[in-house]
Amino acid sequence: MCGIVGGVAERNIAEILIEGLKRLEYRGYDSAGVALINQQQILRERRVGKVANLAEAVAQSKISGSLGIAHTRWATHGKPTENNAHPHTSGSVAVVHNGIIENYQELKDDLEALGYVFTSQTDTEVVAHLINHAMTEQHNLLDAVREVVPELKGAYALGIIHTDYPDELITVREGSPLVIGVGIGENFISSDQLALLPVTNRFVYLEEGDIARLTRDSIEIYAHGVKIERPVKELDASVSNASKGEYKHYMLKEIYEQPEAIQQTISQALNGNALREDFLQFAEADFNQIQNVQIIACGTSYHAGMIAKYWFEQLIGVPCQVEIASEFRYRSPVIVANTLYICISQSGETADTLAALRDTQKRAKAKDIQISTLTICNVATSSMVRETDHHLLTLAGPEIGVASTKAFTTQLAALMLLILKIGQVKEQIAAEQIAEIASQLWHCPKVMLDTLQHNAEILRLSELFVEKQHCLFLGRGTHYPIALEGALKLKEISYIHAEGYAAGELKHGPLALVDNEMPVVILAPHDDMLDKLKSNMEEVQARGGELFVFADENSGVREKDRQHVVLIPEVNAWLAPIVYSIPVQLLSYHVAVLRGTDVDQPRNLAKSVTVE
């Protein structure tokens, strides 16, 4: 969500901070700001809207400094205004903040009683005033921050500077991701390593509760008041490949990158048509013990988990439950022994999923219940990867568009690989079936490429959606979650109200919405549910609805009046959800472009949801 960039160097870092913010734009935001210290003054610029507005203001004001912090804000407390934009100041202190201070109103009341005047509606300004107040009692900035941190309740990351400390940047991680970029004669902080790749590829990943002091030449990290060392990790240069290239939008680029992303993801697990011997080898003992699976995820990742539930139960006979993380953690779930808890997250930092994981681990430990945890994630250095027993990476590369595409399909591929591995370990799937599915996985990128050849057809269909206000997506079996995903994509980026339903539920309510203004998107693979799905299509047409059908070549579904059909290549039934993701992604993309919305950064949304 919000993005932090900060640094301390020997050179002017204003442009570095602005460039860092530009590289964080994909996370979603509504305002941006920067503060630099120069000659014991805080020089600050803040603007509503795009980072480009801030960059123009900085260029005009010509502010500069070798110590500074910058921020993109996604509003949680207070509207998107210049006064609410970060950095916030109090006296000689400037602060940027990601996350939520849950007890900010109580702290604000106390500070107002002391005479502090608030100029914003944010929870962040509380932190600036608290540190300023603590400086009257402490001898240095680090000690003042240490005094304030225990007063803050919530999940947050902080970057703090002070005019009396022109070579010192203090940072705090408590429930919100933060990374230190290690340079030569300069050091930086950010919410995301991608922001710092132009200046360094060496990083230190802060852990929960860490407080760090950065100078030009040193990094000190403290955990629970004790000075500690955290390892410096060098990032593969390929991770920085995050430009749009020849594509108009990141989303379109990432849709077209899916065949290669699937190829990369399966290559880590398959040797020919068999699982590699070293694939998840260290997890085999845990896999042998599991009797149940619980998947925890949010948004698009939740839809991937829904599909995996069908696969777990139908392929290897392991009971599987799937829950939205924000619901799971607050309902006091029963922790069941010998359960594999799977967290799915593109970033590995999704706040609700991470909190659900930690709560589950805490409950299991308190009751001495044996469980295992595993993350499916696209970021090898993320909190979830570090905090689970095992992990399986989706090798999708950076995904910049807010609407997930290649992360989703690689999650599906990774989940299938995981299921094959668990089934093999537990001897609940035949070697012949593993070989068959492995063969189809290798073939999947080719089918995806062939499906992408229908882009022009889908563009023509999208023109019929531009003036619509509502839309239904219908599917059965593993394509019900794809219907949900298609509806999510359309509403995310085109702002058309869309709903996904299991087609069998049509008569239980949604059919009342169907009229000649309601487009209905149907996912119709050639499987054992096709005949029932065709009956649902007839029900829609009988009520005047207009059908947009994605079906495979052997389905027998053909064009007719008010029934538009895109025929895509036939694919193995187990893997059809991966392929059928592409047409709903392309449809949503083209509708959004035709409606003139911001495809890569849709309003009110963030790529990485790091607050609850």
Swiss-Prot record:
Active site residues according to the UniProt entry: C2, K607
Alphabetized PANTHER family for the sequence: GLUCOSAMINE--FRUCTOSE-6-PHOSPHATE AMINOTRANSFERASE, ISOMERIZING, GLUTAMINE--FRUCTOSE-6-PHOSPHATE TRANSAMINASE (ISOMERIZING)
Subcellular location: Cytoplasm
Keywords: Aminotransferase, Cytoplasm, Glutamine amidotransferase, Repeat, Transferase
Entry's Gene Ontology cellular component terms: cytosol
PROSITE patterns associated with the record: GATASE_TYPE_2, SIS
Protein name, as recorded: Glutamine--fructose-6-phosphate aminotransferase [isomerizing]
GO biological process, one term: protein N-linked glycosylation
Reaction(s) the record says it catalyses: D-fructose 6-phosphate + L-glutamine = D-glucosamine 6-phosphate + L-glutamate
Enzyme Commission number(s) from the entry: 2.6.1.16
Described function: Catalyzes the first step in hexosamine metabolism, converting fructose-6P into glucosamine-6P using glutamine as a nitrogen source.
Record-annotated Glutamine amidotransferase type-2 domain positions: 2-217
UniProt xrefs under HAMAP family: GlmS
Quaternary state and interactors: Homodimer.
Residue ranges constituting the SIS domain according to the UniProt record: 283-428, 461-602
Record's keyword annotation contains Kinase: no
GO MF annotations, alphabetized: carbohydrate derivative binding; glutamine-fructose-6-phosphate transaminase (isomerizing) activity
Record flagged with keyword Cytoplasm: yes
